[in-house]
Amino acid sequence: MGSGEADRGILICGTGIGMCIAANKVSGVRAAPCHDDLTAEMSRRHNDLNVLCLSADLLSQKVIDRLIKIWLETEFEGGRHARRVEKITDIESRQSPSGA
């Protein structure tokens, strides 16, 4: 995402939280931990999440597989949600050292 080599990523650690914090330090990344069908779907549909963070310790393999499938198959709705994502991107660009 940050370098443009990939459109999306999936990170898995104990809770999914540490990976999420680290991923969100990379410009252009919008990462969140998802733990159920609704968070996986809405993270894409309303927030255009491009990095899915999952817990290996708290979720079964069956649930992880299902969440990945939902997340990969769900499209961003755009519209009013796109404006919110643009605001987030604007804040990010103002916070980066290069200003870009």
Whereabouts are the PLM-identified features?
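Compact, glycine-rich, soluble single-domain proteins
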Residues: 11-29
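Conserved functional loop/turn residues at catalytic and ligand-binding sites
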Residues: 5, 14-16, 47
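Short hydrophobic/aromatic-enriched beta-strand-loop microsegments
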Residues: 29-36
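C-terminal binding/interaction regions
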Residues: 37-100
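Hydrophobic residues within well-ordered alpha-helices
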Residues: 1, 23, 43-44
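Structural motif
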Residues: 12-13, 34, 54
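Short alpha-helical segments enriched in small residues
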Residues: 1-8
